Amino acid sequence: MSLWDAIVIGAGPAGIGASGLLAENGAKVLVIDEAPGPGGQIWRGVEDVSDARARILGSDYLAGRDEVRRLRASGAELSFETQAWRVEPEGTVWLKDSHGIRRERGRRLLIATGAMERPCPLDGWTLPGVTTVGGLQILLKREGMLPGGPLVLIGTGPLFYLFAAQCLAAGMRDLSLIDTAAAGAIVSALRHVPAALTGKGPSYLIKGLKLLWMLRRAGVDIYNHSGDLRIKSAADGLEVHFRMREVEHRLSASHVGLHEGVIPETHLPRALGCRMHWSEAGGAFHPHRDIHLQSSVAGVYIAGDAGGIGGATVALLEGRLAAMGILASLGRPIDELLLRATRRDRAAHLAARPLLDHLYQPSPAILTPADGVLACRCEEVTCGEIRAALRAGCAGPNQVKAFLRCGMGPCQGRMCGMTLTSLAASTHDISMGDAGFLTIRPPLRPISLGEVADLVEP
């Protein structure tokens, strides 16, 4: 077991920004990521992307190339295709890679695991041909491929519209969008417009308007404020049934992509016992962080979307802020001018975030699905079974887990955890924060007893 000044978990924008700066300032840094290379989800495969594919994915994607090169040149130790399956508050990280199990120790830990797509259980979401928009985008980034049309995208959020525009750039024309954003979202978002017009906010708004203009110009059908969604099997693929303005609609599809925005990936912070709070605007639990981005657990820092959704640029800046906080805590000198400038840049890039959070709030119907909808895919538990357990006396997600095994499968509650919280809140008429969340215990990823037994300490 080696001792590092810092272990960075995640090699997306936040992990890249942090580990590069740490290593450049003489810190001994280990960076781990489950992917084959750096970049995270947003910059996946950017090192070897073709020019043709880069044009499809856009300038924001290609901006990651220079950051990845800086990481490679920084001197940080990079360990890819590596899973962190157990993390301990004092800095011990249990890792699994192609060589087996090993332990590493960090004087400081930085969690930069990014975001995950908000699970959106609805009738038919487990059918063949139904996947997430994020999954389809990974296919485009890694292989330059898209499924054959017609393709129907269901959901809302910036990534929802970005991927639709990328589909157009890749040559797909048989495309329809069903926007599920809450009907009153625009009204609730209006009060945040003035703040969004400050700092870097206008650049984000212009980018979004350009995406919508591209889709409208191409004649893509967009069905706004839709509900009562159902996906059914059909002889030639899939059928999507929904209601818009009290009118029933039906679309044929070969594939369906689901997306209800992204939320922080908080399994590691929760496993470490970091204090969490419910963000009403973000619609998710966020870890508490101080001005240095340190969590409530001493020595554990959280940067990027894992601490709150802000996008790639904010994640990169937060990685650098966390790195400076770590350096200062280790007694290393930091550039105070750079620190202040980075904080200003971060605030400028977050100016439009409240507007976006309110504009793309998911519909309540998505958060509390019908009884017949499968909530836990791993253990095949329906929303009706969860409601019955809650009415029978289960206080919240953890008691439901004990009775029905929700959250005990391979995904460890990543797919059903938010639904459990939503159903507990609605059934008991309490807030999401009071309903709470699943307690996370190691192993965080599936691992065999044989692999643990084969652990050999150097």
From Swiss-Prot:
| Presence of the UniProt keyword Oxidoreductase in the record | yes
Keyword field contains Oxidoreductase: yes
List its EC numbers. Answer: 1.-.-.-
Which GO MF terms does the UniProt record name?
oxidoreductase activity
- Assigned keywords, A-Z: Oxidoreductase, Plasmid
**Pfam families under this entry?**
Pyr_redox_2, SO_alpha_A3
Top-level taxon of origin: Bacteria
Q: What pathway does the UniProt record associate with this protein?
A: Opine metabolism; octopine degradation
Q: Which CDD domains match?
A: GlpA-like_Fer2_BFD-like
Known role: Oxidative cleavage of octopine into L-arginine and pyruvate.
Similarity annotation:
To T-protein and to dimethylglycine dehydrogenase.
How does the record describe its quaternary structure? Heterodimer of a subunit A and a subunit B.
What name does UniProt use for this protein? Opine oxidase subunit A
Organism lineage reads as: Bacteria, Pseudomonadati, Pseudomonadota, Alphaproteobacteria, Hyphomicrobiales
Q: What is this protein's gene name? A: ooxA
